[in-house]
Amino acid sequence: MIQVRKRDGKVVPFDLEKIKTAILKDLKAIGHEGDLEATASKYADEVFALCEQKYLPKTSIFDIENIQDTVVQVLAREGELRAVIAYCEYRYQHKLEREQRVKKVYEDKLMAKHVVNQNANIDEYSGGGRSGEAANVYEKQYALDHCMSEKARRNHENNEVYIHDLNKYAIGFHNCLSIPFDDLLSKGFHTRQGDVRPAGSLNTAFQLVAVIFQLQSLDQFGGVSATHLDWTMVPYFRKSFMKHYIEAWMKDQQEYESSDCLALYDQTYTDALGVTRSAYEKWTDGAKEKFFEKTGLTKDDFKLANKGKLNKRYYNSALADTIQELHQAVEAMYHNLNTLQSRSGDQLPFTSVNYGTCTEEEGRLVTRALLLGSLEGIGFHHNTPIFPCGIFQYMKGVNDKPGTPNYDLKQLAMRSTSQRLYPNYANVDWSGNAGYDRNDPRTYFSTMGCRTANGYDINGLGQLKDGRGNICPTTIIMPTLAMEADRDVEKFMKLLDEKIHEAKDTLIERFNWICSQDPKTAPFMWDNNTMAGYIPEEGIRSAMKHGTLALGQLGLAETLQLLIGCNQTTPEGMKLAKRIEELFSKRCKEFKEQYKLNFGVYYTPAENLCYTAMKKFKAKYGVIKNVSDRDYFTNSIHVPVWENMTPFEKIDIESQLTGYSSAGCITYVELPSTTKHNVDALEQIIDYAMDKDIPYFAINVPNDTCMDCGYTDEINDACPVCGSHNIRRLRRVTGYLTTDYHNFNLGKQAEVKDRVKHIKSFAKKEQTA
């Protein structure tokens, strides 16, 4: 069947009568004589014949612009020059009308009309949000018109292969990055306006983490993460500990009693570099030199493990001061990352921190402080912080069971999860991260909060995570393909294979576009080598090639329902699901070898796409029971949120599919707010997920806070303490949290309401041999 692609991307059946009507209207407008009906029919037939000749061998879908060009060609060939002029004027008028419609959309965004909340972290009513959303209207259109192939545009507009963050395409930004904090904190970094010296204390290091997160987020469109923050902070804990130890020693010296600190601070001197400093600094520097001379200690001695070598009183004093500094530094970081609105729309950087594997006492204290900071909350009412996304790295022999060095930290992590939803759990021993170096935490499995992960780098960096990230994602909207394949399994598999190849081409197009950018477009990133492997002489491709190209998917459950009448919760559905995922995995492995780029299977979060894709699907195919009778598609390979089952059953189902993903996935279970009183049951679930080789796992529990008195629990209509209806209802949107689920788009709100708690049983599932 021949079809027509309209300018808005919609595909409709070809209708020769419409061409005839347009030509007839044109002939009447110029006062053409004779049998106008017959003439218009003749010209319309010629247009169709010429379109068949020019386009049908390549495609059965004619673009409306090509059809109209052919009308002009036929009229000119027939000598109807006045008709050509009139028809061109007609096209021009319609172009102006289309531009007016775009202008109307722009104005609506600018004035915050018809807000849809595409991203729950953006305030579309704010000045920055209105400006950003309005600009996006033209930036998206420019990308579609000028930055990609016709095939990529067609797939995007036809609801088949979605191109994410289209508004950032033209400027050449990439998606996300795991930041090499070890290097940036130890060496310092440059910004456009100045530079920053290496961190000399815990407090400074944690402040700089927030600053670096913010700076890097402005050079990309996605999330930023720290892959092993507990290990990263060990040297800065020791620096602070040494400083506090020396201060304790100084206060015990006789000359300290006779010193006049105020007078010293008032005095200045010029050092060898010409820098003006206070005399107090010179005095303390001199005291430090005396300290090392008199005690015989070196900087390397200041480790908590060296307690026997250090003075007990100074040790205890320094440790108390350092722990206090650590607590305040972590508290400040949490508040900074929840208030540094550095993107348009009062948007916070999407930050994640991975931790939990460092067994050095300093690193253990850092992990403990991060977890206590999560439990304590932020602000007047100790609200649950939505950033950073905390991710506890679950590692066998380190923190998985009683008797391991960091098991106590796992217990604290579970307390935090049961109350604050964070941390999530990254499976360091996941089979997909095989070959990591247990002596190098930079290779441990880590992830972004949403689920993006770095697999094995084919271009030489192996399992290294720091300095790598996702370059760009696409998502295949599988329910559309199922309908286009007439709900036939074999036709669908053939079409899916075709679209996987086309999605690959789309990713390569965007990758090349990104690599064509001047390093000046992201000065912080390239001046400070935050992306690994950057060689200035070779351009930014030298670094980008180490990132991932994510080939995502949406709506497996609905696709199976269309094809065979059931989803992956049934044996028949799971069999076809595995066949589909095997195809994704096989092709990505082939592409990775063929192009020497890190293609990976991605189980898309689809925060906004779940809603927009469904709207387009309904508009074309109508309401289909168990497929489009809701306002959203199910994310990737997830079990539909309305399916009633135990957490163990959900893990059993999704664990059969998560192994196919190499670019990121997540598994959730929904639990009641009473989970905080049953942490033992929570541990059974987490351990079961890790044993089932789930790479990234999260727990959803209700988290409602009264904004008048601060009471936090699952709250119905009114606060049980003060009766207030001013309730913040925090829920998870992808892997991240958001301030209130009413900030989600309508589709995501509907999904939240449909979520059932997996509480059929908390009894531990017996393992079968």
Where would I find each of the regions flagged by the language model?
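A ubiquitous short alpha-helical element
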Residues: K6-V11, A29-A38, L461-K465, R541-H546, ...
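Contiguous, well-ordered alpha-helical segments that form the cores/surfaces of helical PPI scaffolds
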Residues: L549-L562, E582, R732
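Long insertion/accessory domains within large nucleic-acid-processing enzymes
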Residues: D717-A769
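Charged, amphipathic alpha-helical regulatory modules used
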Residues: M1-H114, A750-V756
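Short, mixed-charge aromatic SLiMs
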Residues: E46-C51, L75, L576-E590, E751-K764
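Conserved catalytic cores of very large enzyme subunits
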Residues: Q93-E97, K103-K545, C566, T570-R731, ...
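Catalytic-loop motifs flanking and including active-site residues across diverse enzymes
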Residues: D15, I19, C472, L549-L556, ...
